[in-house]
């Protein structure tokens, strides 16, 4: 393994992880789907494109097949009789990677409208665990995870850069930004994208907190809020 990314892709590792994360509640969800299509009507990606491949339950298909072949009721008998689905292949997981990572924000709209009460977004989150373990997550996510593990920020933002950004905002607003204040009422944590791409957020927060008359602070030890491990489905990185 190079950093957080496996040295090579492995459908077997992905399937093994799928099976490991399919607990009793998720198995019940997978068995409960009636393929009504309600989730599609709630998905922004389907509504925008009207392409069936963006149906939320379709995004789960490789994990569902792994479950049906290896872990569903009577799976051994079905395999013996040739009735079980084929093994999930590397090519299929490559094809599904954009659907699982790039075409789902885990917004949960599909979960809300599901008449069977299936937590579809939660299932996609668990499917990402298998995809990531097998090496099928987007390369950018692995690189962001490596930076997060080494620097604490997925974009590699360091304290020096944060302080420089704060200094610029202090000059623009005329309001000092308190750092590492013990006993503050509020502690602000920022995403790396806000720190780099939208630094005016810090200035806006300064104005809000000053108007509210409360004590607040930004910690130079824990200023990064982005948890790329949750985004990519890696418990090790998320921890």
Question: Where are these predicted regions, by residue range?
Answer:
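Residues that scaffold, gate, or flank divalent-cation-dependent active/transport sites
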Residues: 37
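Iron-sulfur-cluster electron-transfer modules
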Residues: 20-30, 60, 64-239
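N-terminal capping/interface segment
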Residues: 1, 46-47, 66
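Short, non-ligating residues that shape and space the ligands of small metal-coordination modules
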Residues: 42-45, 49, 116, 120
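DNA-contacting interfaces and partner/effector-binding or oligomerization modules
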Residues: 2-15
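N-terminal cofactor/phosphate-binding cores enriched in small/glycine residues
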Residues: 49-62
């Amino acid at each position: 393994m190079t950093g957080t990314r496996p040295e090579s892709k492995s459908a077997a590792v992905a399937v093994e992880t799928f099976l490991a994360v399919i607990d009793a509640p998720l198995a019940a969800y997978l068995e409960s789907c009636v393929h009504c299509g309600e989730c599609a009507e709630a998905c922004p990606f389907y509504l925008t494109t009207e392409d069936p491949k963006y149906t939320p339950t379709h995004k789960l298909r490789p994990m569902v097949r792994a479950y049906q072949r290896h872990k569903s009721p009577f799976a051994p008998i079905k395999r013996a009789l040739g009735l079980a689905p084929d093994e999930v292949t590397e090519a299929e997981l490559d094809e599904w990677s954009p659907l699982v990572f790039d075409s789902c924000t885990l917004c949960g709209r599909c979960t809300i409208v599901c008449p069977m009460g299936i937590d579809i977004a939660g299932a996609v989150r668990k499917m990402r665990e298998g995809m990531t373990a097998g090496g099928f997550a987007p390369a950018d996510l692995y690189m962001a995870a490596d930076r997060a593990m080494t620097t604490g920020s997925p974009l590699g933002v360091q304290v020096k850069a944060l302080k420089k950004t704060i200094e610029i905002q202090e000059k623009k607003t005329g309001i000092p930004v308190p750092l590492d204040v013990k006993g503050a009422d509020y502690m602000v944590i920022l995403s790396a994208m806000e720190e780099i791409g939208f630094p005016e957020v810090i200035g806006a927060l300064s104005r809000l907190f000053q108007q509210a008359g409360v004590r607040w602070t930004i910690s130079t030890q824990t200023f990064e809020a982005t948890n790329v491990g949750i985004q990519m489905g890696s418990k090790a990185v998320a921890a």
